[in-house]
Amino acid sequence: MSKEKQSFEEMMKELENIVQKLDNEAVSLEESLDLYQRGMKLSANCDSTLKEAEKKVNELMQEEVGDKGNEETTDE
């Protein structure tokens, strides 16, 4: 069974479901540990995805600043 990479939104939804299960349902210790472990993995993946997105946004902003700087020097 091959798993496709989950989108950020899918990971967040699964993480929310895990938190709800841990908060609201009577789950065994073993299941709680499994859910906690899965939640930690999802949290790390979400954090990584956000950092990648932030890096891309910063790169795009730097390109925009660079393009405006080039326009100003050619306009003079």
UniProtKB/Swiss-Prot annotation:
Q: Which Pfam families match?
A: Exonuc_VII_S
Which InterPro entries does this one have? Answer: Exonuc_VII_S, Exonuc_VII_ssu_sf
The chemistry this enzyme catalyses reads: Exonucleolytic cleavage in either 5'- to 3'- or 3'- to 5'-direction to yield nucleoside 5'-phosphates
| Keywords tagged on the record | Cytoplasm, Exonuclease, Hydrolase, Nuclease
First-tier enzyme category under EC? hydrolase
As one GO molecular function, the record gives: exodeoxyribonuclease VII activity
Q: Name one GO biological process term.
A: DNA catabolic process
GO CC annotation: cytosol; exodeoxyribonuclease VII complex
Cellular compartment(s) = Cytoplasm
EC assignment: the record states 3.1.11.6
Gene3D superfamilies named in the record:
Exonuclease VII, small subunit
**Which coarse location class describes where this protein primarily resides?**
cytoplasm
Hydrolase recorded as keyword: yes
**Signal sequence coordinates:** none
The UniProt family comment states: Belongs to the XseB family.
User: How does it associate, per the subunit comment?
Assistant: Heterooligomer composed of large and small subunits.
Q: What NCBIfam families does the record point to?
A: PRK00977.1-4, PRK14068.1, xseB
Q: What does this protein do?
A: Bidirectionally degrades single-stranded DNA into large acid-insoluble oligonucleotides, which are then degraded further into small acid-soluble oligonucleotides.
Name of the protein: Exodeoxyribonuclease 7 small subunit
- Report the source organism: Staphylococcus epidermidis (strain ATCC 35984 / DSM 28319 / BCRC 17069 / CCUG 31568 / BM 3577 / RP62A)
Lineage of the native species?
Bacteria, Bacillati, Bacillota, Bacilli, Bacillales
